[in-house]
């Protein structure tokens, strides 16, 4: 018998081996697709957290102008004259361009509010002191709206006619220019104003903010008088460092399945076209080089350019992973990839000393597949398009800063996109309709001589549809509800998480100790029953930065633990995390 087996042909041995290697079952395919979705969700969480941090840390320019008194009370004087009519006109001696800028005959004209302000005093008996108070009050009202070089004068006149005539001298921009005439680049993409426009402080603030977005560029401004009445030059003093930045970081934000240690490196180029634009490209890779059974990597890039009150940003990123997947009698190799292209257009709608309100439109294309043993899993295929409209706001309450956004997001059939194969049966869909809310409040305060800062962050979404895992709210990681190891997440089509953190700066060391308490909840029509819907966790840690002549270094070290979790939810009792960053 042994002799017979010894002479079996090679083809027979191959057949026996192939029979022993079973094909992946539908359950194996579902597990592989889920693993891919979890990896992509982790990468998406990291990007979302970075985007929220960038929003909160974005430069803001605020200028102090005196608050106007609503309507000064006029004194009783002798002599005084009853004034029934007010005239606010630009003197004929000024250029035609200045006269056009100062027009206020129509309700939507720039200075129409000034005429309405004057009308408050119609019918009152006004003397010399009253005229002075009116001119001062109107000047403050104009100044409060940002017209810091516009003036109001009183020409010679006879008040006994019952009319008070005032002269409006519009403050116009003669030139916007660099202090250093040899400086390369332009201010025109950053500033919403041009030569001959009325000088408004809010326009200047917008331009300065757009130039300060470039991290290696700092800008200050002064106003120099021109030759004609009301004319001024806006002179920009620009200080620039090296136009490139390399950032490298390492952390343990990954999972055991695809590499706990993660490394990132990026190159940022400031002003590549001299348009106050920004270009950045980065690469991430797991650092578990000793084990070739699993891994993850990806790259990302974005380009952003301003145009006055507009900002356009084009982003692209990929995520790829592979890992062993244990089946009943054998182990398969599961892998997947995701590619995303995103275009975002932002517009500042209004701005004041304490508030900047904007709108955004965003178009996203997403492609992805999951594989098991190199074979595509049809149910995991993604070719989706999303359109988003939203409002965003930054508001200052004293020393506190609030950043918030409210957006409507919808999946569409544009650009050749297809829906999920489960959508026809009422399952998960990429054609969902969703509302997304983000908010962050940072409040510094002092007890005795010790400064503190309280930071609270909220993220939530609501939809009436069943969405894919990648489009769900997930909780249980360092980017959402802290205190959990991130190996297992709770996910739902609807949900929110709320993070709270108290920071305590340590003297002048650049180090801050912090403690946090987070809570999250998810729910919705999910295809798989959840072990629970709520998580709460606590964290303590230290973070800070250090500047040297060789570069800047940052660190964040923390330990967290669950406060509440469902009984069937697996996680470590204590999770220790870190992130180290170097910038050159």
Swiss-Prot record:
Alphabetized GO MF terms: porin activity; protein transmembrane transporter activity
GO BP terms in the entry: monoatomic ion transport; protein secretion by the type V secretion system
Signal peptide residue numbers: 1-20
Record's subcellular location: Cell outer membrane
POTRA domain location: 98-171
Biased composition (Low complexity): 24-44
Region described as Disordered: 24-72
Gene null: resulting phenotype: Deletion of this gene from the locus expressed in B.thailandensis abrogates growth inhibition.
InterPro entries: Hemolysn_activator_HlyB_C (IPR005565), Polypept-transport_assoc_ShlB (IPR013686), POTRA (IPR034746), ShlB_POTRA (IPR035251), TPS (IPR027282), TPS_OM_transporter (IPR051544)
Matching Gene3D superfamilies: membrane protein fhac (3.10.20.310), membrane protein fhac: a member of the omp85/tpsb transporter family (2.40.160.50)
Main location: membrane
Keywords linked to the UniProt accession: Cell outer membrane, Ion transport, Membrane, Porin, Protein transport, Signal, Transmembrane, Transmembrane beta strand, Transport
Family designation: Belongs to the TPS (TC 1.B.20) family.
Function: Potential outer membrane protein component of a toxin-immunity protein module, which functions as a cellular contact-dependent growth inhibition (CDI) system. CDI modules allow bacteria to communicate with and inhibit the growth of closely related neighboring bacteria in a contact-dependent fashion. This protein may be required for secretion and assembly of the CdiA toxin protein. Expression of this cdiAIB locus in B.thailandensis confers protection against other bacteria carrying the locus; growth inhibition requires cellular contact.
UniProt cross-references to PANTHER family, sorted A to Z: OUTER MEMBRANE TRANSPORTER CDIB, SLR1661 PROTEIN
Protein name (database record): Outer membrane transporter CdiB-2
Source organism of the structure: Burkholderia pseudomallei (strain 1026b)
Gene from which the chain derives: cdiB2
């Amino acid at each position: 018998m042994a002799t017979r087996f010894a002479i079996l042909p090679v083809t027979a041995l191959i057949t026996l081996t192939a029979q022993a290697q079973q094909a992946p079952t539908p359950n194996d395919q579902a597990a592989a697709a889920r693993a891919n979705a979890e990896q992509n969700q982790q990468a998406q969480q990291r990007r979302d957290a970075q985007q929220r941090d960038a929003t909160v840390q974005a430069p803001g320019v605020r200028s102090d102008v005196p608050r106007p008194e609503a309507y000064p009370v006029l004194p009783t004087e002798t002599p005084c004259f009853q004034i029934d009519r007010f005239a606010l006109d630009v003197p004929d001696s000024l250029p035609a361009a200045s006269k056009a800028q100062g027009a206020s005959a129509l309700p939507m004209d720039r200075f129409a509010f000034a005429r309405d302000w004057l009308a408050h005093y119609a019918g009152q008996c006004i003397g010399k002191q009253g005229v002075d108070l009116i001119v001062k009050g109107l000047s403050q009202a104009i100044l409060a709206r940002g017209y810091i070089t516009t003036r109001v004068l009183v020409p010679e006149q006879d008040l006994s006619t019952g009319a008070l005539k005032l002269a409006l001298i519009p403050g116009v921009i003669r030139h916007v220019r660099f202090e250093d005439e040899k400086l390369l680049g332009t201010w025109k993409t950053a500033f919403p104003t041009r030569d001959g426009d009325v000088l408004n402080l809010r326009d200047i603030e917008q331009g300065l903010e757009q130039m300060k977005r470039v991290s290696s560029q700092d800008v200050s401004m002064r106003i120099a008088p021109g030759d004609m009445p009301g004319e001024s030059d806006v002179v920009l003093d620009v200080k620039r460092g090296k136009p490139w930045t390399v950032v490298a970081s390492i952390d343990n934000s990954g999972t055991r399945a695809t590499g706990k240690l993660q490394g990132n490196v990026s190159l940022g180029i400031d002003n590549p076209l001299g348009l106050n634009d920004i270009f950045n490209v980065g690469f991430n890779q797991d650092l578990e080089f000793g084990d070739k059974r699993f891994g993850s990597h990806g790259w990302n890039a974005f380009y952003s350019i301003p145009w006055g009150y507009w900002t356009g940003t084009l982003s692209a990123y990929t995520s790829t992973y592979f890992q062993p997947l244990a089946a009943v009698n054998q182990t398969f190799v599961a892998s997947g990839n995701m590619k995303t292209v995103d275009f975002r257009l932002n517009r500042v709608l209004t701005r004041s000393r304490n508030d900047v309100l904007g709108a955004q439109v965003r178009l996203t294309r997403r492609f992805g597949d999951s594989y098991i043993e190199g074979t595509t899993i049809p149910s995991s295929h993604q070719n989706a398009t999303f359109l988003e409209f939203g409002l965003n706001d930054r508001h200052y309450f004293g020393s506190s800063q609030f950043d918030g956004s409210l957006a409507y997001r919808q999946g569409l059939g544009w650009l050749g996109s297809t829906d999920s194969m489960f959508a026809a049966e009422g399952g998960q869909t990429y054609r969902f309709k969703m509302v997304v809310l983000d908010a962050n409040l940072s409040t510094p305060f002092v007890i005795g001589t010790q400064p503190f800062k309280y930071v609270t962050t909220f993220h939530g979404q609501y939809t009436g549809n069943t969405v894919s895992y990648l489009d769900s709210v997930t909780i249980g990681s360092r980017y959402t509800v802290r205190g959990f190891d991130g190996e297992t997440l709770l996910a739902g089509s609807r949900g929110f998480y709320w993070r709270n953190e108290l920071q305590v700066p340590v003297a002048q060391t650049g180090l801050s100790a912090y403690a946090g308490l987070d809570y999250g909840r998810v729910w919705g029509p999910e295809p798989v029953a959840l072990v629970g819907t709520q998580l709460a966790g606590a964290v303590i840690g230290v973070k800070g930065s250090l500047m040297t002549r060789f570069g800047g270094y940052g660190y964040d070290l923390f330990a967290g633990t669950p406060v509440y979790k469902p009984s069937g939810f697996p996680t470590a009792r204590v999770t220790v995390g870190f992130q180290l960053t170097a910038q050159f």
